[in-house]
């Protein structure tokens, strides 16, 4: 039980399972806070951000790049035992290379006309 997170890159006409590249995280609560802030900024309810495929834009990835490089200092998770909030600083440090790999892959994919998605399950 807990927070599982996924991101993938695919061609526009491909299904989710026909992705070109993917990555996953486990209980990376600060990444979740960041992604949830995008979801809410788009006019969605915070409570609805579970098991939803959210397409990310180049602007989203630019913001994510900044968040990663600052250890998500503006996206501290205040609660959420099952999200791993109690060890969120360590999770951000441990995921740093993976997060940057995702950022780089996402920028490259968008430049090539591919789509980038994020989803979570908790």
Give the residues covered by each predicted segment.
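Acidic (Asp/Glu-rich) sequence patches and key acidic residues
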Residues: 1-114, 120-122
């Amino acid at each position: 039980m807990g927070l599982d997170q996924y991101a993938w890159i695919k061609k526009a006409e491909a299904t989710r399972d026909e992705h070109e590249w993917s990555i996953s995280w486990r209980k990376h609560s600060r990444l979740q806070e960041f992604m949830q802030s995008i979801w809410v900024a788009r006019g969605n309810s915070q409570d609805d951000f579970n098991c939803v495929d959210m397409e990310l834009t180049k602007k989203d990835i630019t913001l994510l790049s900044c968040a990663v490089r600052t250890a998500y200092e503006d996206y501290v998770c205040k609660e959420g035992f099952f999200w791993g909030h109690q060890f969120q600083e360590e999770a951000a440090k441990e995921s740093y290379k993976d997060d940057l790999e995702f950022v780089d892959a996402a920028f490259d994919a968008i430049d090539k006309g591919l789509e980038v998605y994020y989803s979570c399950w908790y």
